[in-house]
């Protein structure tokens, strides 16, 4: 990596992503915020350090705004991921009921699992079979159960 020519990294692209307001940049920001929290929890295994909780709460507030302002453009998977992160941080979301209402209308016609049909990002056959919906359904279950980390004393 250190021997890679500098021309292979284009920071202008990163700048455009960070400052643009396209649908894709919104999704990338949402993904970035949720995965910062998931990483800080060491993939759900530890509590967030109290000293860091304020900044992760800011990230959740920003993520919540992205979802609220673009509700039909954000996948059900991303909404559940946000709820999982809110649970990790003890954040009370003002849009949780809206997300759960969408979930209540998203049961697959041929099985007892959740599919994504109410969003602009939903595709007729993209992740709407049992195997393709696994990640979404795991996130839903995680968002609806208490966060019980293995390590309750984060370092």
List the predicted regions and their residue ranges.
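Terminal, non-catalytic domain-edge segments
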Residues: 5-16, 41, 88-155
